[in-house]
């Protein structure tokens, strides 16, 4: 089974899980770990304890809120130090939904394609992609002649 840990600063991960539950119903394979402002326990300890409760054959994904953030950096380091999971930085709801619903592990090129697909959800719906890709037209500057107007 795929186990998804949403890891964020503040309440973002809990809010994302709430959204997943609204769409999917029970999401017992989605878990939340948050870094609170006054937290004394390192987030890495929380994740290690959570992973210890999973089955040995589960595939674990830790989806973090921001690339380069303390949460993300701690998860990357933890994954390099022997705890087996895949880190995906900058998660969004479509990515989390797809991983939560997948009956099989998503790895390699398939995971890369899923991440690219999730990026397509980040758009300005009021400006079609074609318009955004087109070069902007330069406005013509008004011509002013120096001196008083000629009659």
Task: Give, region by region, the residue ranges found by the protein language model.
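N-terminal loops that bind phosphate or other acidic moieties
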Residues: 1-61, 67-151
């Amino acid at each position: 089974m795929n186990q998804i840990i949403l890891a964020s600063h503040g309440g973002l991960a809990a809010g994302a899980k709430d959204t997943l539950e609204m769409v999917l119903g029970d999401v017992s394979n989605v878990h939340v770990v948050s870094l609170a402002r006054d937290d004394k326990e390192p987030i890495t300890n929380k994740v290690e304890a959570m992973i210890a409760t999973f089955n040995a054959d589960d595939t674990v994904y830790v989806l973090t809120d921001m690339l380069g953030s303390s949460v993300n950096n701690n998860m990357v380091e933890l994954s390099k130090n022997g705890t087996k999971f895949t880190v995906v930085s900058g998660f969004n709801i479509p990515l989390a939904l797809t991983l939560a619903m997948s009956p099989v592990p998503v790895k390699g090129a398939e995971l890369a394609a899923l991440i690219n697909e999730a990026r397509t959800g980040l758009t300005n719906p009021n400006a079609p992609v074609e318009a955004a890709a087109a070069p902007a037209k330069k406005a013509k500057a008004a011509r002013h002649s120096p001196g008083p107007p000629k009659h």
